Regions:
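Glycine/threonine-rich phosphate-binding loop and adjacent beta-strand/alpha-helix elements that clamp
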Residues: 11-187
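Short, small-residue-biased leader/transition segments that mark boundaries at the very start
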Residues: 1-2, 6-13
């Protein structure tokens, strides 16, 4: 996947990245399922990566994982990932999405030091999708996907117990260690 940019701020809780097309939205049926997505990098807090067009069909069957080397200026934060198929005419539809936190991916008992590199893995629900020849894959990374996922306060601790929020500045470190793991199905 080709990089467009690799750092982004989180937003205040009044300006979150909205869920648009999702597999676990319980608040409104209008946003559920695979829906037409906005353009790549449509907000300053969304980083998009786009592949070259595929020469042949790509059957995906199972759990998609997005491995990222990241850093932030706070002691915990969330990272979301949304994988999409971009058709030759430019229309993009979400395939799957997921979320994780830095704390969730640390070994038991360890804490994150702001500014250090951390490895996170966004694990998505199992699925079956065939990306068509001529289409591209697009991955959007952010720190919110609301209301599909609860708002992260950018403080360490249990999300639901936090009384305040703050803006975090995220970085995705490209190269070895940051990649998308696709479960491919051979016909």
């Amino acid at each position: 996947l080709h990089r467009r940019r690799h750092s982004f701020p989180t937003r205040r809780s009044s300006d979150l990245v909205p869920s648009h097309g999702a597999e676990s939205v319980l608040t409104t049926i209008a946003e559920a399922g695979s829906l037409l997505q906005p353009e790549p990098d449509y907000r300053p807090d969304v980083v998009s990566f786009v592949s070259a067009p595929l020469e042949k069909a790509l059957p995906i069957c199972g759990q998609i994982k997005v491995h990222l080397n990241v850093s932030t200026d706070v002691d915990d934060t969330a990272f979301t990932a949304k994988l999409m198929e971009v058709f030759p005419d430019g229309r993009a539809y979400n395939i799957r999405g997921g979320i994780t936190t830095i704390a969730a991916d640390l070994p038991e008992g360890q804490t994150y030091t702001p500014g250090q590199t951390a490895k996170v893995c966004v694990e998505m629900w199992d699925m079956n999708w065939t990306v068509q020849p001529g289409s591209c894959l697009r991955l959007d990374v952010s720190s919110s996907d609301f209301p599909q996922y609860a708002v992260h306060s950018n403080y360490a601790g249990v999300w639901s117990e936090q009384e305040k929020t703050r803006i975090a500045h995220q970085k995705i470190l490209l190269g070895e260690g940051s990649f998308v793991e696709l479960p491919l199905h051979e016909n």
